[in-house]
């Protein structure tokens, strides 16, 4: 795996921890091409962060700050290593916690986000994801427009989304389906 574009372009990321399925370079490249205008200066939340490849791509492309969340200590260590490799650690926070527990904390201590990236294991149930999506809620999202990106297996069920969200775009890369959600008024 490597960083596709931006300040860390071409830098190789470290080994993938056991049980982590990172988004392919091709899918990341396509996704971030679609998000080209949203990433610069964005505050980003990377849930189910794994190796951190999605959030690191956002940082490399000019995101102001990324909060990485993964429940695995091995994944958190890999994220720290990859942030050091790419020299992007100064604009990142790594939290070792379950995604649902992280979004359930009240009040949000990490501010509001312009972009939320979710790349859960394909076997995470749609109902579990619905809890996480509800937990993201309006108090965690920017008032000036936001995008939530969910990666699922093409054979995985997709969650029911909050009523004020709309599917803005769907992208398919091999066995991955990438869904971009936006607030109804912004879609």
Residue positions per predicted region:
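Class I S-adenosyl-L-methionine-dependent methyltransferase catalytic core
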Residues: 1-187
């Amino acid at each position: 795996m490597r960083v596709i574009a931006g300040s860390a372009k071409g830098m190789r990321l470290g080994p993938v921890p056991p049980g982590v399925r990172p988004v392919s370079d091709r899918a990341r490249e396509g996704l971030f091409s679609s998000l080209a205008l949203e990433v610069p200066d964005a505050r980003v939340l990377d849930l189910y962060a794994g190796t951190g490849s999605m959030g690191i791509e956002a940082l490399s492309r000019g995101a102001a700050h990324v909060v990485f969340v993964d429940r695995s200590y091995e994944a958190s260590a890999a994220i720290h290593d990859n942030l050091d490799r790419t020299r992007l650690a100064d604009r990142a926070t790594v939290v070792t916690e379950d995604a649902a527990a992280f979004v359930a904390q009240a009040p949000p201590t990490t501010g509001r986000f312009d972009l939320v990236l979710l790349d859960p294991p394909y076997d995470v149930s749609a109902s579990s994801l619905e809890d996480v999506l509800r937990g993201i809620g309006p108090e965690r999202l920017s008032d000036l427009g936001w995008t939530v990106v969910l990666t699922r297996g093409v054979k995985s069920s997709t969650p029911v989304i909050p009523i004020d969200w709309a599917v803005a775009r769907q992208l398919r890369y091999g066995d991955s389906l990438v869904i971009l959600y936006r607030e109804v008024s912004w879609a």
